[in-house]
Amino acid sequence: MALLQISEPGLSAAPHQRRLAAGIDLGTTNSLVATVRSGQAETLADAEGRDLLPSVVHYQADTLRVGWDARQQAAQDPANTISSVKRMMGRSLADVLARYPNLPYQFQASDNGLPMMLTAAGAVNPVGVSADILRALAERAKTALEGDLDGVVITVPAYFDDAQRQGTKDAARLAGLHVLRLLNEPTAAAIAYGLDSGQEGIIAVYDLGGGTFDISILRLSRGVFEVLATGGDSALGGDDFDHLLADWLREQAGVADRSDHGVQRQLLDAAIAAKVALSDADSTVVEIAGWQGEVTRAQFDALIATLVKRTLMACRRALKDAGVSAEEVLEVVMVGGSTRVPLVREQVGTFFGRTPLTSIDPDKVVAIGAAIQADILVGNKPDSDMLLLDVIPLSLGLETMGGLVEKVIPRNTTIPVARAQEFTTFKDGQSAMMIHVLQGERELVQDCRSLARFSLRGLPPLPAGGAHIRVTFQVDADGLLSVTAMEKSTGVEASIQVKPSYGLSDAEIAGMIKDSMANAQSDVGARMLAEQRVEASRVLESLQGALASDAALLSEAESTAIPAAVEALQQATQGTDPAAIEAAIKTLDAQTQDFAARRMDASIRRALAGHSVDEV
């Protein structure tokens, strides 16, 4: 819903005065800013008429260049020219170096392990570099709209995790921007197309940008945009096409020295120019490092065929998650400049069996959708029939006894969402509980990703099972998770907002989902074993307490049979057969039934001692 403006009684709320809002596509390779003017969403160009702003920043001791000017410095001064910084957002230095070992920057670790790049202007980090890009886009919007922005919607890849999303918000704050919402890039594209067409059905959004690939399966119904499933790869995009072609050109040109960053940049620029030319022509001529040769579209297609196939495998997984087939998809929306590559369009069309939609510039469609959403959220539209539902990529839950995972919010649940479950204590007199928040699809804690831990203290010292703790998981519209635990009788409460230090890539998410499928049967067996061991532990602990207080109530036969049944259960718990443990529990239960009945009678007699029948 739109954000409402409230005025003092007797004063006009100036409904005719539009608030200034913008949608920002903060991309890996290029970024854009768009707004709604005269009812139409449009991207805003710079003084030279260029809509795209290269996501590049060049740092010098006393100057800062962003965009095209910075990109021109990349070949001459690569160490001070930061590009594709979005790939580093929310990642540790070790992760960045492992994923991208050939980056021409001088790195150092910050106190929290995040990467810092040493430049002539000092140390900069991915959040600060992103802020410089956002600041340049905001200045462009301010000039075009002749005023400061009241709010922005910034798009992020669908699989950005909490740390990456929070980093984007922090960058916007540093740039002096008020973030109305972070919006998934494929969802923004759906807004750009769906509002105009108003059609209903299943739509696939294929987003292949400079550095990330996302596939989203959406259902459009009566103005409701629901994301059924998402998938992709945060380390796959047009940049990878460029690097493959650059490596091929290096071999053809006989360039052996990989340490010359200037030559590296020239090779990359030549590869980018060739890729663009091959989108319209069957061949193009390349001149680099004294070498001149021809590159054909067929040669380029052969280089990138494996990467394109990887995107289609992700599409197949997303369709399976959504529970739909390719034949059920009505339209395929193409997003990202890399979808201009003829092989990509051809392969995607073949996979889905229909010609992809490209009527909106694939470079601009995400920014346009973000601008439409920003215009609504800032309050320019008092109401809207559009409802937007994103999803979480992996299940969220917490650890229970025995190292088991209790899922509270399943994956692909629409957000924002809040879910709660009740838990209880395991031991008598337990006064504290450790809440361990987990992410993943497996049944055991050891196979899932730990997100956070916090303690709930001050529980009433009741018998096991006496305290009732309500744990609430809440995921906001930006995908950030908060967890609250409250003991119901006392109101004692503790909470935490999950903000992981490091990111989780699409490949790792896909791997976790794949592992859960591959290990489904063994996981079920492991869970059954763990559950029976927990139940056995509970039974043995309860019996130990009963024997400590009422051993005198045992019959002679029970004095022999019960210890034997206890030993049998203890031995069974050392094994790996849940059925054997369950059988041993039942045997022990049968051996202790009469003892339990005598304990109950004795307890009642003690309670009634000294009281008359009338008092009872």
Curated annotation (Swiss-Prot):
PROSITE patterns: HSP70_1, HSP70_2, HSP70_3. One of its GO terms (biological process) is iron-sulfur cluster assembly. Keywords: ATP-binding, Chaperone, Nucleotide-binding. Disulfide bonds: none annotated. Chaperone involved in the maturation of iron-sulfur cluster-containing proteins. Has a low intrinsic ATPase activity which is markedly stimulated by HscB. Involved in the maturation of IscU. NCBIfam families: HscA (TIGR01991), PRK05183.1 (NF003520). This is Chaperone protein HscA. It comes from Serratia proteamaculans (strain 568). The gene is hscA.
